[in-house]
């Protein structure tokens, strides 16, 4: 903050002139006034940006960004709409029925599967700042060589862990980890499912000694939490299966390869947990956040986007680290974090031309101005794929980047973007909860084994069924 008492009137005047010049430069250069988009300097006569934001946790920040953009661009018109969680596509489908001056101009798809649904609305981004500001243009989703969607954030997920709790555990007699002071970090000690299970089982056995409720946070099946398992955890067996079978793109069918490895890691989550399986159906994402942030659990499956919630709940940045999710696959000691994006921006080609131009002007400012870069990288905590962006002020992003940078580590691809439908995910989710509840009589009881067999059929046979349904539509 500038302190007025320490500056002379002349210095203040100079600063005011500099600020005005910078704002003017941003408004007339960096904000997209170029022949490429046919913009003009009379912004009040221009179009409107209607941004359909996908991430509810960033709603207030996007409103701030819109207000700041309007403040330094008198006459600019921008509206941020944020559908409720799990209703994005339904609300978007309704919104694009509006006339061209009122329909969304900037919206999100989740990758190739989403593009198949929305390709009739996606504009060619060849001349858009969204595409031209990418640090690696190969990240864009293309159709016949034309960029149609651009990832605005690359994210990582894995097992977030509490460093302070693991350090306390490592100091216990006969613990399964050595203190990091001995020269080997926790993430370099836990590099396989076998080691993770050994540590988690011992943490659970000694939970009273450590003052925790369990090794893992609750695997809640409320809609605020279940996506962590039906989508992100399910990615792990699919990734190894696709890698083994050299699958590219979306397959019409899958196999049973590695599905039982899915069971191994999920069993660990629910047996070494803060919560009995009988309560999982109502446990929420917020419950898991608080269990972890308050030191009641050591491990929490989530991603880099979770830092805001964790920080707001009181955990310190120096107390968090991240491990890959191990499932007992051969060669997993070389595995990095699950890294990718299901967050692609598209410009709506059915919106009016003036609204598309206004949207490109807004994006130019967002991706090149200091304020826009700070909003994306720091306030929203995104690891962005655009040119000349600062590192995100997010310890989970840094932990993931540092781990994946280790020699020989291979990031796990987000193949879940090829899942055939939400119906497939929901069927897997329902059967996964049924299985969890069946384990009350033992992880390998007859009821649990039967429930798992049902899930495997939903996983494999359901994929082929949902793929046929999705691709039979004209």
Where are these regions (language model features)?
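Conserved N-terminal structural module of periplasmic/extracytoplasmic solute-binding proteins
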Residues: 2-114, 127-132, 173, 178, ...
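Extracytoplasmic/periplasmic substrate-recognition and gating elements
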Residues: 77-79, 313-381
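Short helix-initiation/N-cap motifs at beta->coil->alpha
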Residues: 82-92, 191-195, 279-294
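Alpha-to-beta junction loops
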Residues: 96-109, 210-213, 294-302
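Hinge/lid segment of periplasmic solute-binding proteins
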Residues: 108-169, 173, 321-325
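Extracytoplasmic/periplasmic solute-binding protein
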Residues: 146-152, 157, 194-250, 297
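Glycine-centered hinge/linker elements that transmit conformational signals in sensory
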Residues: 200, 244-283
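Conserved C-terminal helix/tail region of periplasmic/extracytoplasmic solute-binding proteins
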Residues: 373, 384-396, 405-474
């Amino acid at each position: 903050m500038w302190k007025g008492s320490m500056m002379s009137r002349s210095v203040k005047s100079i600063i005011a002139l500099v600020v005005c010049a910078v704002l003017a430069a941003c408004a007339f250069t960096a904000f997209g006034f170029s022949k490429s988009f046919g913009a003009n300097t009379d912004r009040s006569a221009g179009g409107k940006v209607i941004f359909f934001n996908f991430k509810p946790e960033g709603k207030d920040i996007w409103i701030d960004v819109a207000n700041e953009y309007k403040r330094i661009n008198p006459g600019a018109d921008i509206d941020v709409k944020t559908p409720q969680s799990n209703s994005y596509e339904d609300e978007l489908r309704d919104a694009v029925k509006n006339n061209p001056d009122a329909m969304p101009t900037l919206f999100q798809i989740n990758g190739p599967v989403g593009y198949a649904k929305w390709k009739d609305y996606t504009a060619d981004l060849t001349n858009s700042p969204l595409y031209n500001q990418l640090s690696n243009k190969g990240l864009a989703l293309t159709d016949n060589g034309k960029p149609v969607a651009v990832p605005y954030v690359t994210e990582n997920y894995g097992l977030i862990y509490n460093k302070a709790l693991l350090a306390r555990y490592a100091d216990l007699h006969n613990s399964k980890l050595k203190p990091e002071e001995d020269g080997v970090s926790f993430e370099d000690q836990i590099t396989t499912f076998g080691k993770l299970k050994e540590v988690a089982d011992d943490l659970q056995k000694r939970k009273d000694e450590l003052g925790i409720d369990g090794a893992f946070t609750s695997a809640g099946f409320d809609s605020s939490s279940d996506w962590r398992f039906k989508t992100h955890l399910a990615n792990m067996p699919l990734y190894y299966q696709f890698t083994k079978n050299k699958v590219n793109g979306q397959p019409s069918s899958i196999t049973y390869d590695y599905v039982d490895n899915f069971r191994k890691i999920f069993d660990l989550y629910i047996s070494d947990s803060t919560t009995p399986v009988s309560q999982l159906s109502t446990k929420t994402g917020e419950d898991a956040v608080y269990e972890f942030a308050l030191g009641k659990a050591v491990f929490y499956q989530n991603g880099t986007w979770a830092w805001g919630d964790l920080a707001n709940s009181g955990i310190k940045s120096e107390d968090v680290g991240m491990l890959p999710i191990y499932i007992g696959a051969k060669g997993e000691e070389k595995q990095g974090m699950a890294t990718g994006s299901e967050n692609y921006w598209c410009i709506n080609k059915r919106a009016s031309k003036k609204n598309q131009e206004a949207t490109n002007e807004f994006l130019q400012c967002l991706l090149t101005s200091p304020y826009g870069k700070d909003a994306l990288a720091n306030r929203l905590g995104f690891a962005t794929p655009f040119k000349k962006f600062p590192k995100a002020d997010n310890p989970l992003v840094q932990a993931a980047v540092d781990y994946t940078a280790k020699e020989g580590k291979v990031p796990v691809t987000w193949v879940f973007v090829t899942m055939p439908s939400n119906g497939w995910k929901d069927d897997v989710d329902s059967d996964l909860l049924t299985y969890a509840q069946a384990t009350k009589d033992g992880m390998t009881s007859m009821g649990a084994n039967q429930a798992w067999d049902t899930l495997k059929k939903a996983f494999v046979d359901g994929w082929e069924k949902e793929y046929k349904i999705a691709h039979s539509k004209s």
